[in-house]
Amino acid sequence: MSVCLSLFDWAQYRTAKGGIKIHTSLDEETLLPDIINISEAKLSDRRGIDDFRYPKDTIVVDDRGYFDFKLFKSRIEDKNHLVTRIKTNTDYESIEEFDLPDDKNFEILKDEKIRLKGKVAEDAGINNLIFRRVVVMVEQQGRKTKEITTKPVALITAQKNIYGGLVYLSYGKGCIKRAC
């Protein structure tokens, strides 16, 4: 969002232009922001949510811009779950592939247990953790997405709405939040 530099001198974006970003977390029941962080526009989306903390057992649904191993570690240490699109160049090892139902209407195309590999995963301390990698058909857009999660049932119940709108479903006692 563009702002006037003479009023918001802290929000310098370019030499003669000011800008801010509003990083939000949406409450899944009310669809209203429950956490807001206003920052200068040059701060990355990922860094804009560093201070977001959620109640235990929250399922946090993030877009690929928040795909960050240290963020994953933080979410797991806070006893929360994550669902996010996996980056195409992510180094991982497939440990086990799960059978899928014979139902042709089933939108999950692949479900596997994985371990993240590489120096970045090792440095973040998540190289020994088990994740699920799920390939999902997003019917509204006619394309596949590849997701990584710590709670596979959450992905299955929430995935339809990750990119089609801002409504996220609850699973069990956990609630789903979206950082945007």
Provide a role label for each language-model segment.
Residues 2-180:
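Single, function-defining residue in the core of a domain
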